[in-house]
Amino acid sequence: MLYFIFEAISFNSTIREKSLKTYINYKTLLYSVALALILACLSSCKNEVVSNPGDGIGRERVQPRETTETSKETKAETAADNASDGKIWAFADGKYVFNFPERSDEGLATIDEMYDMSTARFDDQPDDWFFGKTVRDNDTGEVTYVWDRSADTLETLKKYRTIYRGDETRKVCYLTFDCGYEYGTMDTILDTLKEKQVSATFFVNGHYVRSASDKIQRMIDEGHIIGNHAVNHYDLTGVSVDTFLEEVQGLEELYYETLPDAPPMLYFRPPSGDCNEWVLKFADKLGYRTVMWSWAYKDFDTDAQPDVDETLEKVMTGLHNGEVMLLHPESKTNTEMLGKMIDKIRDAGFEILPICDIE
């Protein structure tokens, strides 16, 4: 009897031992599966790229796939939000987006200074408005400065934050257009800029705002900057204080009446480039930054348009660091050569950036 009891106890212990081993093996299996899942999760997380706002402009956060209805808006908003650290532009979805601050016109509090200020032109200003001339060797890329403005004039430009050339240590170029938008070339020009993903600055006057607001809206929608070119394209160097206000503030008022959702207008270019310290100071009091140019050519005579290939060669010979290029859209030559010109400038190692890149 004792023998059978002992055998029963021994058999029962064996069963418990086997059950315990099974339980341990099962628990080990569960831990292994859990560990594998954790490792897989960590590996997946490493593949998610999240940009730091300090890493650069225009780099987007990698997001889960968005719906068609909201993806473009969300990406544009993300890019605009990332335009920080002193930058007011970003690049997203093949175009530039801007986060412009409202312009301050606090300088109007001291507008009385303008009544007694001299309206004389700069001593070194010729009949046309060029701040200097450069010649580039297209084989070596070496740029020679043929002539430049006087030290006094350059100091005056700097005093009022006037743009005529960007950072001369960087291979970068800025495209600007003046007037001539009513010659039927704008759709082609905008198509080319969109294809090449280039942002330009368009300085507009009152006639164009009134007659072609749809084209201006397209410029805004496709990542371009709109600048103030005054209402009537007068020479502003000798006008009265009231006339200057009517021309410059009047253009802005017309602009917002026509396009109430347009972004702030920050840049001003004097009609025909006619300029003196009085104009620069007045524009500065209105909160504008005046934009001139460091390269242009005679492209505005619609009855004597230059050859495309010769003009491309001229463009490349004049190419220089920080170049602010002036083009007129009424030019058939410009319209035809624009795409090739952009390619050649980039092939030479230059970036083409929005004018707001200039600090």
Language-model segments: residues:
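N-terminal secretory signal peptides that target proteins for export/translocation
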Residues: M1-N25
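Short stretches within intrinsically disordered, low-complexity N-terminal or propeptide regions
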Residues: S10, A36-I38, T78-N82
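Serine residues within intrinsically disordered or low-complexity segments
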Residues: S10-S13, S19, S32, S44, ...
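Sec-dependent N-terminal signal peptides of Gram-positive bacterial secreted proteins and lipoproteins
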Residues: K27-E48
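Alpha/beta-hydrolase fold active-site neighborhood
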Residues: L30, G56, A230
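N-terminal pre-catalytic segment of deacetylase/amide-hydrolase enzymes
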Residues: C45-L175, E182-D187, E195, F350-E359
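Catalytic domains of cell-wall/extracellular-matrix polysaccharide-remodeling enzymes
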Residues: E102, T188, R210-S211, Y234-E359
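Active-site beta->alpha N-cap acidic-glycine motif
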Residues: V135-T237, T243-M265, D357
